[in-house]
Amino acid sequence: MTLILNNTEVAQAVTMAECVDAIEDAFIEVGRGWAMSDPRIDRHMPTSKEAIAQELGIPVDQLEHKILNERLAKDAYVEPEAFNAPLIYMFKTMFGAIHKTGIAAVRTSSEVMSMPVVDGKLRYCKIPTGPGGRYTSLIQLFSARTGQLLCIMPDGYIQRNRVVATGAVGTKHLARKDAKRVGILGSGMMAGGSIEATLVVRPGIEHIKVFSPNAKHREAFVERWREQTKIDIVAVESAEAAMRDVDIAIGATNTFTPVLRGEWIAPGTHINSTTPGETDEACHRRADVRVMTWWSHSDRFDADNYVLPAAPEAHVKMFSSKRKEDNSPWRLNTPQWPTAELGNLLAGKAAGRTSPKQITFHINASAGVQFAALGGKILENARKKGLGHEVPTDWFLEELHP
């Protein structure tokens, strides 16, 4: 039988501590050579409000209102500016497999996005065009022993947890053991998850500063997480104020414009960045130790062939050639920019922090093995707890030779 899970059941199946442990185990296997990932591939094709409205069967002048209201009804948020930038259809894939657990995972995302300028910064926005203001993004788990389809689940909960749990693993091995103060840029799901995951590996955290451009959002975020964690969490008025005088600096934004500046980082700080482009070159230059989740992620911007020539210029530039320059800090593990891989760090093949004064920098990029790690743990726990709905595996099999 093949198990079908929804996001509520996924959340019930696993704790954040289990996510951190599963990610750590997976990257140890990566370092040992017994787990694999494919590069994340994004494929971009222009679409439009007119085309979306026509397919949804509504007047185009009602599209924005419909989507924004449907999201607000779910206490979720879409930047209104997202509709003012050119719209792009994006199909994204990631793959990973772990020999030890016998799990292979494929993540597929079929979505509409745009890149508006919000508060002077280029943002990455996903627009929920599915029924009820929802997204279409799935994870399929396969047996790496028999090839059979084991489970299908949405990726929303795992998407957040695989990123923040990986960041927490980096923090566990790179941040100072006596870290007490955290600064966070962002007030969305990644920021909240980063608080939860960081507390798993550094339970002694006493003070957290938060900045995001929307004052209303950051105040609500701080209030919610202060109540949930019982920790001294405060909202501050600038990115600089959030990053000054902290032991752990976390970027959890959706911007491609540098907002975390190396000049603000004190000696001894650990930087955990979740979004390509949110840190400036000074962060890379000042770091004594740089670790990337997975090297191959740094090459995904070379994939010119996956952006249609007719795509808006901003998308072509962002997703093809922007970071190809040989002297770019995104050309990782070069003599100018030496970088370790997280798996090698965990497997003892690369050095981490050796001094309390060092600045360490975890470039927390994507790797498909994250989905195999968390997906496998969720499947294991869901079966034990009786979560989800089973359907016949026969539905997904064929007699013809593929």
Predicted regions and their residues:
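Glycine-rich phosphate/pyrophosphate-binding beta-alpha loops
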Residues: 155-159, 273-279, 365-368
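N-terminal ligand-binding/catalytic initiation module
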Residues: 1-168, 178, 369-372, 389, ...
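Adenosine-phosphate binding glycine-rich loop
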Residues: 7-10, 283-402
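Rossmann-like adenosine-cofactor binding region
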Residues: 230-325
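N-terminal Rossmann-fold NAD(P) dinucleotide-binding loop
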Residues: 191-192
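NAD(P)-binding Rossmann-fold cofactor-contacting core
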Residues: 201-226
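Short helix-loop-beta connector
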Residues: 174-181, 204, 266-267
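Glycine-rich Rossmann-fold phosphate-binding loop(s) that bind the pyrophosphate
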Residues: 187-188
